[in-house]
Amino acid sequence: MRRFTMLASLLMVLCLQMAAQTWEDVKVGTSTRKTLTYVPKNVEKSPALVISLHGMNQDPGYQQNQTQWNALADTEGLIVTYPLGNNRMWDTHGMGDVMFVEAVMKDMELKHHVDKNRIYLSGFSMGSW
């Protein structure tokens, strides 16, 4: 039993030292949208933020794997978030997704204390529209 307790304690410590990746809810007007956020274990006190938008018919997981922003986050101590477009697309004709990205920025400032002077937007295909 003692070995099990020691092993469980060691696993807990190792898990706490690992980077955190979570789905976060972002309020946009009366609706709630999702963004996949990666926070490295060595995050700065007031980190930079990269917002990375996926292409049409893709999702945040795909965008994350293709861009490798998380590796840069691990090296530089910044935060990366991958918003999810409605129906895996972005609104190219209205302002809905502009408001979503603005809400993501404000949400990241509140939750993760990102430096609002170091927020960067990146996208692929329809996500770079």
Regions found by a protein language model. Give the residues of each.
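Bacterial N-terminal signal peptides that target proteins for export
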Residues: M1-A8
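A domain-start/cap signature at the N-terminus of enzymes
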Residues: R3, L16-L49, G61, M95-G96, ...
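Bacterial N-terminal signal peptides
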Residues: A8-C15
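Short, structurally constrained coil/turn elements
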Residues: L14, G29-S31, D74, M108, ...
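Short substrate-entry loop that stabilizes the transition state in hydrolases
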Residues: V43-W90
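Alpha/beta-hydrolase active-site loop
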Residues: H93-K116
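Alpha/beta-hydrolase fold nucleophile elbow
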Residues: H113-S125
